[in-house]
């Protein structure tokens, strides 16, 4: 088990998965609630934690299947204990080594892709998992433009791939995505960076 998996197992056992759900919830829900999703879509959440996004999406009538993956066994255990719908499935796996024939219309990731160092291999796997015209919505608070979060790598002492917004978008384009980005802020949050920089969402559409 690598350092990142061990860390997130500890977090799952100490209530941090619920803390992350609450901490990310404002900007993620703002973003997800504005998405226009097609009929009969299949959804994947990479680094799903306790499965809160999978549960939210599975409640949409147009969602036919919602899968969450995480390399933390304890996070997946938590997610399975909270299942609300038969549409939901959860798997303990790293993205890059996940052996699946599944294809998805929508793939989502919040604060997880940068734990794959370097990120290019993970992003290539995402591209392969998407159907034609599928979309990858990738959220991150850890990017070099947001200088107040760059210390996280030292604080957490696990491998993390730090890029600028420009570098994120270039990486998506190089992989083959049509790409744009947007920031979602939380104007009432006590943290300055959440008010001013917010969550960076890089959006990639597969041609």
Per-region residue spans from a language model:
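Short, glycine-/aromatic-enriched active-site segment of Class I SAM-dependent methyltransferases
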Residues: 141-159
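Class I SAM-dependent methyltransferase SAM/SAH-binding core
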Residues: 44-46, 50-97
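Core SAM-dependent methyltransferase catalytic element
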Residues: 188-207
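A short glycine-rich, Lys/Arg-flanked "PGG" loop and its adjoining helix->strand segment in the class I
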Residues: 120-132
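Short alpha-helix
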Residues: 160-176
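A conserved beta-strand element that flanks and buttresses the S-adenosyl-L-methionine
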Residues: 108
């Amino acid at each position: 088990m690598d350092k990142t998996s061990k860390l997130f197992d500890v977090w799952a056992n100490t209530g941090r998965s619920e803390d992350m759900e609450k901490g990310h919830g404002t900007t993620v829900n703002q973003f997800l609630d504005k998405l226009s999703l097609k009929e009969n879509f299949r959804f994947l959440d990479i680094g799903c934690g306790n499965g809160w996004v999978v549960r939210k999406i599975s409640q949409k009538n147009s969602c036919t299947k919602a899968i969450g993956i995480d390399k933390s066994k304890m996070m997946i255990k938590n997610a399975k204990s909270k299942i609300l719908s038969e549409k939901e499935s959860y798997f303990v796996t790293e993205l890059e080594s996940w052996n699946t024939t599944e294809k998805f219309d929508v793939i989502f990731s919040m604060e997880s892709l940068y734990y794959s160092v370097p990120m290019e291999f993970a992003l290539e796997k995402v591209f392969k998992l998407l159907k034609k015209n599928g979309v990858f919505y990738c959220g991150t608070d850890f990017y070099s433009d947001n200088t107040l979060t760059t210390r996280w790598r030292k604080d957490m002492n696990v491998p993390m791939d730090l890029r600028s917004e420009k570098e994120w978008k270039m990486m998506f384009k190089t992989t083959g995505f049509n790409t744009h980005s947007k920031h979602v802020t939380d104007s009432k949050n006590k943290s300055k960076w959440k008010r001013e920089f917010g969550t960076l969402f890089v959006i990639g559409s597969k041609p």
